[in-house]
Amino acid sequence: MQIREVFDRKRFVFLDGGMGTQLQARGLQPGQKPELAALEMPEVLTAIHTDYANAGADILLANTFGANAKKLTGCGHTVEEVVSASIACARKAADTTGACVALDIGPLGELLVPAGTLAFEDAYKEFAQVIRAGAAAGADLVFLETMTDLYELKAAILAARENCDLPVFTSMSFESRGRTFTGCTVESYAVTAAGLGADAVGINCSLGPKEILPFAQRLCRSVPAGVPVFVKPNAGLPNPDGSYNLNPDEFAAEMKEYAAIGVSMVGGCCGTTPAFIARLHETFSPLTPADKIPIRRSCLCTPVRFVEVNGITVVGERINPTGKKRLQQALRDGDSAYPCTQAVAQAEAGAQVLDVNAGLPGIDEAATLEQLVKDLQAVTDLPLQLDSSNPEALSRALRIYNGKPIVNSVNGEPETLEKILPLCKKYGAAVVGLALDKGGIPPTADGRFAIAQRIVAAANAAGIPNEDIYIDCLTLTASAQQEGAVQTLEALSRCKHELGVRTVLGVSNISFGLPCRGYLNTTFLTMAMSAGLDLAIMNPNTPEMMAAVRAYRVLTSQDLQSTDYVAAYADVQIQTTQTSKSAATVAEVGAAAPGGDALFEAVRRGLKAEARAAADAALTMREPLDVVNVSLIPALDAVGDGFEKGTVFLPQLLQAATAAQAAFEAIKAKIAASGQAQGSKGKIVIATVKGDVHDIGKNIVRVILENYGYDVLDLGRDVDPERVVEAVRQTGAKLVGLSALMTTTVPNMQATIEALHAAHLDCKVMVGGAVLTPDYARDIGADYYCKDAKASADLAKQLLG
């Protein structure tokens, strides 16, 4: 098959199946690195590829899933050697049938900043090395799979796009709740990957065909029509013995439903064998892929928050230094705490997007905007509007943004369009076009509409579709140009209905220089919404403005069943009073006000600097133990409960833990200064078992346990059973946590548990990892199975207090 045939959708394209279980079944020993199979057992590896090719696979994934520098450290071989040998084995098999060879790339095994410690550009470099090696070795395409972190996937896509000219396939793994391990939604994945230039997108691993089907349907609706969708499910769900519950016939029968939803490529993942692919080939070969009918929608996103701009959407305006001395000083000082608190406050007030501007004379705008984006991504899950016309600042901010942002802005000048539109296209961003040019802002609606037409045409020519174009017809102050308000609204309405794009306005500009600005702002906002305004850049902390937005959504059926309106105002009492000027004002009483515990709120929000300051303040009035038990632990519990319920996601959980750690440092310092002994709730030993180099889950467990007051000895990854036994013996730990991600290393987990039992140590063992289930954990001798870090903390509290 020629690589171009993969995309023509004339027939189904067949991917291969599982590799790890095949290697294990054909002689790979526990602890042996699967990535080295091409060097240590090339005949076996080639035979596996050949079996898949003979079963009908059109694309063979080379055995390079973990062939990166981090995972190959200490193995005695370079990335280039391993990748080249692996591609050669796959190519030898592919040549017998004409199949294509994919450079298979999996996750690096570490969380990226801010959730972890791996920098975005460091992840990029790791992927780039593998991709260059794969391209040099003759791979036909790059296949990024089993990703759970959208930020890591972005680094990998950029590495592929910038270091080779091969097609790029991307695939993420979703849990049963419809989100990845880090909380990414199907829609956020779809629009981000497609926006970055992925040639095909898909879903693999974690679940079986039946469970993945609804997520694949959402994926097909969310990617552009020209981007193929593929699926590679597991062979059903895992059994207690590590096998899977579907045979080839059952697998193919469940997979057949995908033929009708727009998927055009099918294959298998864990537990599938050449027999599964052969049966899949037999089932799908007579069929033709159904047309994929995506929904063309305007949207912005972060991994966990997908904002569809289908009606009035609020953009918080407070992170803009214009006229804000406190923010100006914070930007000059490099103080991230203040803009972060502004971000959190706007989110809680109802903003759905945050405008971020670092344009201040005397500072490095590019460096400041880049750092602001990093800092804000750590504390809020709202999409960002990158407010700059500086190409360097936008390039740096767009590169490290996690998701799909919007750029504010371009104007009608060709030079600006030529510099900024390609950046928006490269990074998959939406763009705001200002209806002005070198002649300034036209006084009439016709003049502004003409500029908008030029902007839309230029954006379309750059490959940016109408749904990603937002036109700002510009709000002029009523005090200076009173007739301008009507012209703005007329131009806005024409852009919305004649050009088929979205609209945006900075609403508050209308009232500059006039008294009682809130009256004008609210009235103009209502008029603009009626004219077709989509993005309202405004202060969400103004109750009257948010009330107008929420009421408008109810009256235009955007807020179905008035759900959001009722949630906001069910407990609000309206009081009408007379001011000194005899003007009636409305005060909202009983709205959700922040509680009196500043430390609790800072930890809950994940604000590190505020948590430290609140702890310092609390310690001047309260005993350290009281601060821990009344503020810190309840805050962590609240965030943990949200995580269990699916309302809080991994990044927020880790940010709360980081904020709590900052508070704990203040508490430790207070205890040390008082000369009091610092007690521990108990000692826990944790490790990733021998042969496994994945430690994301283990590291998260460590952070959470430490913040609950336990002494945690982290032995790292690829840990021998003897080291675990010795650590427990030396520390007297009563609880041991073992982690494994790969099926090939679960036997080493069992060996470690057996070694602990043989040593007659008085400890309990909890285990976790993607390949484990409660039944499987029991079968290998573990005392407890913990599905996540919160479960580990709950167990520690149960056993150790």
Report each predicted region and the residues it spans.
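Domain-level signal for soluble alpha/beta catalytic cores
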Residues: 1-801
